[in-house]
Amino acid sequence: MGHFDFERFNGFARQSLDDLLFSDLWDYDIFNERDMHSSAYFYIRDYFRKHERDSAYVRCEPQLAGMRPDIVIYERGRPTYVLEFKFFSKPDYINEDAIYDDLDKLADCVDAYDSIKWGFFHLIYDAEIPFTLSDSRLRRAGFSKISVTSINARRKEGTDRRRNNYDEWRGEFDKMQELHRKHA
């Protein structure tokens, strides 16, 4: 089992988890924030299972520092990572107040527990104009030890190119989401 490799998990949380969540979105497995939590929970548990980390466990919405973060990862009973998720399915809509509420929650958890190494915030949205929060912007706003990754369903991060087959995907996504609404 060996020593826990925090840097490896940080890389997973910042890159691989983001890619996996995008795949689930694009494959019509994520339609709302709860679906996003469920997918992330599965992939995080699978990550620890593959790395034989019996002392690490994952919980959804536990009570922590008077709040309920979406996901908390514990190592030997101590909170080590906290994760928050936001999902905005409506095109060209982002609620920045809701984003900053979650960032505040992460910051409060990080401040309350010395054992917490990082807080991770994952955002899925669909917009023509990319929404980003750089590490330097986060630090200036007082958010240290917090990483933000975002998935724009319409445009690729970095290149800002429109995704191939976006219009077809969006049409199907809207159709399927409308069908699900009667069961919500």
Q: For each predicted feature, which ranges?
A:
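Residue-level preference for long, well-ordered alpha-helices that form the structural scaffold
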Residues: G2-D5, F9, N95-A98
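Short catalytic/ligand-binding loop motif for oxyanion handling, primarily in non-cytosolic enzymes
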Residues: H37, P91-D92, E128-T132
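Active-site metal-binding core of divalent-cation-utilizing nuclease and nuclease-like domains
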Residues: R53-Y81
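Non-catalytic C-terminal interaction segments of nucleic acid-processing enzymes
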Residues: R139-A184
